[in-house]
Amino acid sequence: MSFILALDQGTTSSRALVFDHDGNVLGLAQKEFRQIFPQPGLVEHDAEEIWASQLGVVVEAIARAGITAADIAAIGITNQRETTVVWDRRTGRPIHHAIVWQDRRTAGECDRLRAKGLEPTFRNRTGLVLDPYFSGTKLAWLLDNVPGARARAEAGELAFGTIDSWLVWNLTGGERHLTDASNASRTLLFNIHDGAWDPELLELLRIPPAILPQVVASSEVYGETAARFLAARIPICGIAGDQQAALFGQLCDRPGMVKNTYGTGCFMLMQTGERPVLSGRNLLTTVACRLGNRTEYALEGSVFVAGAAVQWLRDGLGIIRTSAEVETLAASVPDNGGVYLVPAFAGLGAPHWDPYARGALLGITRGTTAGHIARATLESIAFQTADLLEAMEADAATPLAELRVDGGATANNMLMQFQADLLGVPVVRPRVRETTALGAAYLAGLAVGYWRDRAEIGRLWQAEHTFEPAMDRDRAAELRSTWSRALERSQGWAQP
């Protein structure tokens, strides 16, 4: 019997999961790594620490599954997107810490590009907005601020990649420098219509083409692991950015199907088929996956801070000891007591796109308790999701039938019920909640014939629980109206 290994490299931890043919998790390992905050608004990772943590959990997950590396049929990779790494091709060493997707250091550069009237150019070609969130301006910053980097890049000595590229480079012992189309579509450098790096956008951001990875399909055999890592050469066969992998793992394979992932951030994607739909409401158009010559697209809304707000309660305020305690604390009060948290710790993402927004806690009175703050924190995740869905339904001109959910915070029943109440549609939690890793596993397995086709994996999806809306629609509208007032007060707070 053989198995599929999925590498799930996230914003706060590296994970590895072993799946069997029925999509069951046989072994799982996870390791957190450092979050580096050099200044307010700046977020970095040590890329070498990411690699070490990822390799460590791979070995641990295989051991926990009770198998050997020789039993692995294929490896799939899913990753935090946009996070930018540049390394020396000869030594394999990064020239700087990785700049994380949450980092806002290039807000001024985005403003300058916008002032030149270039927003429509980037928007129409990439499906993205000009925002520090994406990789392009991060890469330009590294080339401009690391001594000698630009000259070395132009000489072909440096390699750029998102985290998937960094992992593949290391897994193959430096033999392969590549990224899949879903990750490439998050860089501000990739033309989603042509399916290739865009020469004009590269010129606008002063990016030498020699630094870029090869763009490949999301499901194909890219190469094999170097034998020194796992005592076996295992095919690396599937890659997708974390949110696209979750869309695939949730079997949202028909236009109009929507999933929302509740992780560090919160990310909603709607499958739109083979036609890229450009949003009129500040959503993103992105590549969902590339299978052979077929490219599928999605509309996306990205919330920067979701589960990270709960981590702030734990690490910043110290009102909970573990993230799981937030549900009990929030349940200690009957409602939010008029308290609203806008967790704009790294600005606001879709549909607002305000890099200068900052976090705000509003409605506090002498009677406000830790329970009210905990409840407001959970509710902020649902409010941001509701803003996304409203914009998405308008762009697609199609009302949502159900919302499929995944990610760590979906274990929080209070949050899921409030989400259904606020949206007025069923919220469906799948039996296998590890849908991001599962999507990467499916992509890898399809490449080597472990699963025959999407119809076969489609039969594996099952709902574990459906949360039906129970709140009066007038009450939901009232709550959302107050949320909007709070949102307005957080916007434009930081100085450009």
Swiss-Prot record:
Residues the entry annotates as binding ATP: T11, T12, S13, T264, G307, Q311, G408
GO MF annotation: an example: glycerol kinase activity
PROSITE patterns (alphabetical): FGGY_KINASES_1, FGGY_KINASES_2
Origin superkingdom: Bacteria
GO BP annotations, alphabetical order: glycerol catabolic process; glycerol metabolic process; glycerol-3-phosphate metabolic process
Binding site for sn-glycerol 3-phosphate: T11, R81, E82, Y133, D242
Protein residues bound to glycerol: R81, E82, Y133, D242, Q243
Reactions it catalyzes: glycerol + ATP = sn-glycerol 3-phosphate + ADP + H(+)
The protein's Enzyme Commission number: 2.7.1.30
Residues involved in ADP binding: T11, R15, T264, G307, G408, N412
Pfam families xrefs: FGGY_C (PF02782), FGGY_N (PF00370)
Activity regulation field: Inhibited by fructose 1,6-bisphosphate (FBP).
GO annotation, cellular component aspect: cytosol
Transmembrane segments: none
Keyword list, A-Z: ATP-binding, Glycerol metabolism, Kinase, Nucleotide-binding, Transferase
Pathway: Polyol metabolism; glycerol degradation via glycerol kinase pathway; sn-glycerol 3-phosphate from glycerol: step 1/1
HAMAP family on file: Glycerol_kin
Protein's job: Key enzyme in the regulation of glycerol uptake and metabolism. Catalyzes the phosphorylation of glycerol to yield sn-glycerol 3-phosphate.
Family: Belongs to the FGGY kinase family.
Protein name according to UniProt: Glycerol kinase
Species in which this protein is naturally found: Geobacter sulfurreducens (strain ATCC 51573 / DSM 12127 / PCA)
Native organism taxonomy: Bacteria, Pseudomonadati, Thermodesulfobacteriota, Desulfuromonadia, Geobacterales
